[in-house]
Amino acid sequence: RTWCRFGRRIPYLFIGSAVAVAVMCLLPNAGSLGMAVSTAMVFGLVSLMFLDTSINMAMQPFKMLVGDMVNERQKSFAYSIQSFLCNSGSLAGYVFPFLFTACGIANEAPKGVVPDSVIFSFYIGAIILILCVLYTTLTVKEWNPKEYAEYNERKPEADEKKAGWITLLRNAPSTFWKVGLVQFFCWAAFMYMWTYTNGTIADTVWHTSDVASKAYQEAGNWVGVLFFWQALGSVVWAVVLPRIKNERWAYAISLLIGAVGFAMVPFIHNENLLVLPYVLIGCAWAAMLAMPFAFVTNALEGYGHKGAYLGLFNGTICLPQIVAAACGGTLLAMVGSHQYNMMLVAAALLALGALSVSLINKNKPQNLTIQQ
């Protein structure tokens, strides 16, 4: 129903990116628009909501393009390329504020105002997004419905039959659910990393839990450096992943490496040595961005409603984080209220994710239609 002369996925990519660019230009200026504090906070929250929605609107179609146009044998490689490029973008995002500061652009600002180095980073990110989307839009030629049906060896009308999300889930291939289980453990683990890394590093390296202290702020600054190294590890590992012939082994090994990284964090008391575990964590992150979609899109061959299924699969990213956030306080109390122990919880979750990979079967494409 969404096929038009501009393609099936490209319009979503273009519109979602356009909204994201607009928000990226407005968001860092929230404190400079003369609004009251409460109004500025609401503006920021609404802007983040639009940014998150628009980025999802843009990212899902380019993942679907791989599922639409890349054969089964090369999908893992294609998703690894996407993982490499995504993490390269993250790397650039971490570098730009430091680079602008080194060039003499102010890294400090009055209370309630974002520093120029951060504002310019947002602008550069918006420009890069525009250029990348324009390149994709102008160079990728999507198939028309007939070509798509011929390539995927199914009838053109297979995607036209209406089906509710409950019906789709009931008819989903088993791989959809098995990869979803792996996703649950992985995204819960990373939710705890994002939530508790700052407090962990402040406690184990700077020996403080006072969020108002200078030491805590220094720890927060160093977390940004560690996330840079995580992104760098992801970029490098995304190049290695396609060279591992067995996809399940590649996925499981990556998650186990990440689990080792999480487990190391509480026991390292030197900020420079913390680079190693975060590089290892980056290996798991690279696999999480590439492997799940390769398994699921291969399993969905012949099912139809691929876009709807990938949209539903996005729930395996959101729901684990919601559950992890809801349970985080209880778990923290259970592990002695020490934030660094949550990194061990994250390690255990990632290890469970690695073990769950063994449940995934390599499905052969099928010619199926949705049963109402």
Model-assigned labels for residue ranges:
Residues 1-7, 235-248, 332:
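Helix-to-loop junctions at the C-terminal end of transmembrane segments
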Residues 13-38, 257-269:
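C-terminal ends and interior cores of transmembrane alpha-helices
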Residues 31, 35-47, 57-58, 62-63, ...:
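Intracellular loop-helix junctions on the cytosolic face of multi-pass helical membrane proteins
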Residues 48-52, 183, 187, 271, ...:
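Helical-face signature of the major facilitator-like transporter fold
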Residues 57-70, 287-302:
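Intracellular juxtamembrane helix-capping segments at the cytosolic ends
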Residues 80, 116-117, 207-231, 312, ...:
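Loop-to-transmembrane helix entry
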Residues 248-292:
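C-terminal transmembrane helical hairpin of 12-TM major facilitator-type secondary transporters
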Residues 303-335:
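A late C-terminal transmembrane helix in Major Facilitator Superfamily
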